[in-house]
Amino acid sequence: MSSGANITYASRKRRKPVQKTVKPIPAEGIKSNPSKRHRDRLNTELDRLASLLPFPQDVINKLDKLSVLRLSVSYLRAKSFFDVALKSTPADRNGGQDQCRAQIRDWQDLQEGEFLLQALNGFVLVVTADALVFYASSTIQDYLGFQQSDVIHQSVYELIHTEDRAEFQRQLHWALNPSQCTDSAQGVDEAHGPPQAAVYYTPDQLPPENASFMERCFRCRLRCLLDNSSGFLAMNFQGRLKYLHGQNKKGKDGALLPPQLALFAIATPLQPPSILEIRTKNFIFRTKHKLDFTPIGCDAKGQLILGYTEVELCTRGSGYQFIHAADMLHCAESHIRMIKTGESGMTVFRLLAKHSRWRWVQSNARLIYRNGRPDYIIATQRPLTDEEGREHLQKRSMSLPFMFATGEAVLYEISSPFSPIMDPLPIRTKSNTSRKDWAPQSTPSKDSFHPSSLMSALIQQDESIYLCPPSSPAPLDSHFLMGSVSKCGSWQDSFAATGSEAALKHEQIGHAQDVNLALSGGPSELFPDNKNNDLYSIMRNLGIDFEDIRSMQNEEFFRTDSTAAAAGEVDFKDIDITDEILTYVQDSLNNSTLLNSACQQQPVTQHLSCMLQERLQLEQQQQLQQPPPQALEPQQQLCQMVCPQQDLGPKHTQINGTFASWNPTPPVSFNCPQQELKHYQLFSSLQGTAQEFPYKPEVDSVPYTQNFAPCNQPLLPEHSKSVQLDFPGRDFEPSLHPTTSNLDFVSCLQVPENQSHGINSQSAMVSPQAYYAGAMSMYQCQPGPQRTPVDQTQYSSEIPGSQAFLSKVQSRGVFNETYSSDLSSIGHAAQTTGHLHHLAEAQPLPDITPGGFL
């Protein structure tokens, strides 16, 4: 008890004094002392009575004689109440049911009650009409800091704020109108609380127990010893008045009194707790230390959280051995503050748990006095999460004058006495650290420092507790590794311009072999510390060893190799060209376009899969072998390239006598290997039709790269101007339209030479042939529309034969084209003009007579 001016509040109870050492028996014998024998018998009975109390052993060991008697009376009264309130069944009274089954049921009920108390946001409190605490649940310690044994059978007014005592007394009365007058109500503030109720009611004078006005819901402030409060905690009481049976109280005349009303309530904090408080409210533990912080005791929760037994904690020596080296100076500062002021204040640090694990805790230590002198230290710790601990660590680093956080402060007037374990950078792991590397050249010995000093505690710590566990090993999936390797290099740097798909395949296989060699280094290379590695433990539990991993890798490698070898025999319809391949090709084209510098560009050869290449060659050979119904049209290819955004004045241009539609945006197209084309004399009567070009030697020097979409015939059936062509990129079917004469094309395409060429709404008669995506419809030439600035498209060709003239135009002439939106690329209806600009030196070039077809 701590008393003030007419105010008394509950405080920490007096504990059982330390047992004195037994004096040796004198040689002359034991002297007869009846008083001493009586005290010894009394102490023995009290110890036996204390052992029967339903409290943990650590609580019983701290009880004094008066507390043992008080708790014994309280236990007997509670047992009498439950004997009446929870009446047993007739079978139980007669012993008809199995005793073992009854014990199991009682144990299950006990466990359920414990779980309910833990889930409850508050504690259970039963207060009699004379203001005595009849029962308080053990969870009261989590909210008020009082032990259950400290408050049972004590006056409740010692816990209530002096301004709220009158309200609590009013709530205890069944009519909310206590019989005491104002003067007696003032007695609530007296040192011993209000007087006991002198008026006892009979059941006839009291209302029924289940009446609605017997319910209670009110608020008051209770004394709180926890560090996160100001000394009082506002609580909400919700419950009802019920009869307290089985007390067997007697009046002054010796007559048995009827049961009286008592308040059965649940007290909950007004401010709801946070999620972290809910999680950690049941993990607050306390430790007892000597004045030099040597542990001498720990409660059951502390042993559960830290993993140590009380013997292991008390036999290690200084308590600083359990504190992280980066927190030692911070805790030492709080230790000195506690010695000076009696309380350390809130201190956040890391405690060493069992199995070399660190736990962030928030601690507050108090100095306990005995006979006016400091005797020992009681520390209350609350576990924190790692995020909370790091947040406090950052605040500490910013506020303190030197680095408590990393241990860089100077101790014992030596410069940097700490070993490399204190170095925050780089992070050291078990895989790259050995005991020899850890030890400095001149490590101070343990004997050179005081046993209770910080340096001695630091040296006694094992350096393995500061080693981080090794990072997880590389994944064993060969597809993941091959995908990562393939994304690291560009196609331009990895392969030669004249290479083929075999080079790409060989390169990927080489990477896979390197990965397999790296992964086949064995357990010693892949797992530096097998015993402490989680993956190794999982593999061992599943019965998988490193030989199995190598076998799976080899099987995957041969499966991939055999699939690639047999790709040429797969039907063309079964080839699955995924979005990943198309995306990768498009990204490669974008990268190559960005590398262009002025008019020079390094030649880049686009490689595709061998399966597509072989299939396309086979299809084209079959087309050439079939006799055409009419004169064969020359097989050409249309390119679609990514163009840089430049505004130039476009013109309409005929290349080799045909009109090409170039897409200014990068479409997703098939890239096919170039094939040598044959020349056919189709329109020998037309003027300006050139079958032999004087620019053939310059084909290989063209600094442009071109993506081609395969096509057998660029001429399509007639379409309306308003119809936009949209051909699928995978399913190709021959046209079913009737055949027309080739002379119709001549009449449609012959226009005066001095006119610009545009697009007419009239459709052209075309000769049907098998076509693929990328082939565009042809229309009659009309005067071109007004010139508008459009984007620039760059392309180049590397094909022999009839494309020599196209290469010459690219290298020496500047041609700009403007087309209607009808000739835009497939799927791009938003583009109003199509264009083609060849990036080359601007030189005058005479008009080309329109003739010939692509």
UniProtKB/Swiss-Prot annotation:
Residues 26-79 form the bHLH domain. GO terms for biological process: cellular response to 2,3,7,8-tetrachlorodibenzodioxine; cellular response to 3-methylcholanthrene; cellular response to cAMP; cellular response to forskolin; cellular response to molecule of bacterial origin; circadian regulation of gene expression; negative regulation of DNA-templated transcription; negative regulation of inflammatory response. CDD domains: bHLH-PAS_AhR (cd11436), PAS (cd00130). Keywords: Activator, ADP-ribosylation, Biological rhythms, Cell cycle, Cytoplasm, DNA-binding, Nucleus, Receptor, Repeat, Repressor, Transcription, Transcription regulation. A motif (Nuclear export signal) lies at residues 63-71. GO terms for molecular function: E-box binding; Hsp90 protein binding; nuclear receptor activity; protein heterodimerization activity; protein homodimerization activity; RNA polymerase II-specific DNA-binding transcription factor binding; sequence-specific double-stranded DNA binding; TBP-class protein binding. Residues 346-387 form the PAC domain. GO terms for cellular component: cytoplasm; cytosol; nuclear aryl hydrocarbon receptor complex; nucleus. A motif (Nuclear localization signal 2) lies at residues 36-41. Residues 440-451 have a biased composition (Polar residues). Mono-ADP-ribosylated, leading to inhibit transcription activator activity of AHR. Residues 111-175, 270-340 form the PAS domain. Residues 49-81, 116-124, 264-266 are annotated as: Required for maintaining the overall integrity of the AHR:ARNT heterodimer and its transcriptional activity. A motif (Nuclear localization signal 1) lies at residues 12-15. Residues 1-38, 425-451 are annotated as: Disordered. It is found in: Cytoplasm; Nucleus. Homodimer. Heterodimer; efficient DNA binding requires dimerization with another bHLH protein. Interacts with ARNT; the heterodimer ARNT:AHR binds to core DNA sequence 5'-TGCGTG-3' within the dioxin response element (DRE) of target gene promoters and activates their transcription. Binds MYBBP1A. Interacts with coactivators including SRC-1, RIP140 and NOCA7, and with the corepressor SMRT. Interacts with NEDD8 and IVNS1ABP. Interacts with BMAL1. Interacts with HSP90AB1. Interacts with TIPARP; leading to mono-ADP-ribosylation of AHR and subsequent inhibition of AHR. The PAS 1 domain is essential for dimerization and also required for AHR:ARNT heterodimerization. Ligand-activated transcription factor that enables cells to adapt to changing conditions by sensing compounds from the environment, diet, microbiome and cellular metabolism, and which plays important roles in development, immunity and cancer. Upon ligand binding, translocates into the nucleus, where it heterodimerizes with ARNT and induces transcription by binding to xenobiotic response elements (XRE). Regulates a variety of biological processes, including angiogenesis, hematopoiesis, drug and lipid metabolism, cell motility and immune modulation. This is Aryl hydrocarbon receptor.
